């Protein structure tokens, strides 16, 4: 599924089911340098069990356009904008690794928009190596 957020195209895997605004929304947020592919099995499961399941590619990742966002706060605001862009008032969030930091921040900033929060493989903020950043920037 493709849609626009802040003028940039966003790609989100729907788990093999069409998006239906009547169904509750779950947004899956991947870790640093990863993509929607992190969530292949999870999105499919929830899509086939009554949910709108969106595994988004953050800007500058995977099939989404735009520059990579520079802070957890920017990413959290972007996730809130995704909820608006797909026409929902609230969503459940699932984060992995850096996606945990993003979803926690989003929940803190927009509590009325977040129904539930699930975290997998999260950690506190850690320094990122130059090699990791360079590989992401050049998409090696």
Regions found by a protein language model. Give the residues of each.
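N-terminal cap/lid segment of alpha/beta-hydrolase-fold proteins
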Residues: 1-9
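Conserved small/polar residues in nucleotide/adenosyl-binding loops
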Residues: 131-140
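Active-site micro-motifs of SAM-dependent methyltransferase domains
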Residues: 34, 60, 100, 124-125, ...
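Conserved hydrolase catalytic core segment
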Residues: 90-127
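Conserved catalytic-core motifs of eukaryotic protein kinase domains, centered on the activation segment
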Residues: 38-40, 64-69, 128-130
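Active-site loop/oxyanion-hole signature of alpha/beta-hydrolase fold enzymes
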Residues: 13, 48, 52-94
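Conserved HGGG/HGGXW glycine-rich cap/lid loop of the alpha/beta-hydrolase fold
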Residues: 11-63
């Amino acid at each position: 599924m493709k849609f626009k957020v802040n003028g940039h195209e966003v790609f989100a895997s729907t788990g093999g089911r069409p998006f239906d605004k009547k169904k509750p929304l779950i947004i899956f947020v991947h870790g640093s340098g990863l993509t929607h592919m992190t969530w292949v099995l999870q999105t499919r499961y929830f899509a086939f069990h009554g949910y709108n399941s969106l595994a988004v590619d953050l800007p500058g990742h995977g099939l989404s356009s735009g520059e990579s966002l520079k802070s957890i706060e920017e990413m959290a605001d972007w996730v809130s904008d995704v909820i608006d862009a797909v026409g929902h008032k609230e969503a459940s969030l699932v984060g992995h690794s850096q996606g945990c930091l993003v979803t926690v921040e989003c929940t803190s900033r927009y509590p009325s928009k977040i129904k539930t929060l699930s975290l997998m493989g999260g950690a506190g903020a850690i320094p990122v190596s130059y090699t990791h950043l360079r590989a992401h920037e050049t998409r090696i």
